[in-house]
Amino acid sequence: VMAKGAEDRAFYRYLRLASLCEVGGAPGQWSLSTDALHRHQVDVQQHAPLAMLAGTTHDTKRSEGVRARSLALAEVADDWAAAVRSWFDGHGELIEGVDAATVLLALQTAATAWPIDADRLTDYLVKSAREADLHTSWLDVDGAYESALARLATALTDELSGDPADELSGHPTADGSDGDGARAIRDIVDRTRRPGWALSLASLAIRLTSPGVADLYQGTVAFTYSLVDPDNRIEPDWEQRRALVETAARLDGPTSWEHDDVDASKAVVITRTLALRQRRPAAFGGSAGYVPLEISGIHADRALAFARTAHDRPVVVTIAAIRAVGAHNWEATTIALPEGTWRDRLADDEQAIAGGADVPLATWLDRFPVAVLERLDE
């Protein structure tokens, strides 16, 4: 009932922020406070320390990379709404016969799974429409409606992949408008791409160091932008993944991030954090502890920090930026770092930091969206 009534029906109809409509998700809950998240983490450690923490699976409607870019999109909600209105105004003829919710889904999907080609977007929109069972369905296919979805997908991907100096699509929009809406959509795609990567890396590091057992779906050592089955079952390029892990062994997080080698950034977070877990099993098992850490200052609401303890002593600290769009004054935002001597294992040139004091988050987050610290004085 849950799968067919909610996840495979209602979740394809409620599309204000499509990434909330995930398997096991609660679309009505837009966010959690950091305090609520900390309480949840403590509860998991106490009652389900071996629970699986999945990011992407064979059945997710959007991979973790797509969802992170959707969260970045939500950070610029007003600009996104204006861009969508402009796009609707300029594409009346193109979207004739397609309901507004599905058009909104197409725009969100193109923006958060970009780059995506017309065939993939068409397949996704058709599957989504059939699951929604409003205008077409698996048992009663409406060929005209699905053809309209294909035209929409083709026009949208052409616009987003075209030359910005040539009205994006190389020609006026379907009703002769000047393409301002398409330009606005593309601008937001460009603005939220890197913040989306940052949020994905932050989410990954949190998952790898939280109570529970983190699961890494096949091929997700690199950024993937897969959609619902069967898109998320495509065989990964294993040679490329092996080469990526080898590259990550020669780089650290800040270096890969500075050079926009974001796949290497993700591989660095995975390989180094898993190595830390192997060195510090007592900090992650059933007898480990979880301690929220206080963040203070001008952007305290934009970061999250916690410690994992072994034998009641903090030995691992995770610090992550949880909002990524716009400027951040990390120098004026501090963490109450526990006693001890600490080093960020995601950065090779990081100097040891003394705890027992408030330390500016700029120490780490000015260079990389996340830090995973290990205690040295043991």
Segments from the language model and where they lie:
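Carbohydrate-interacting/catalytic domains
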Residues: 1-378
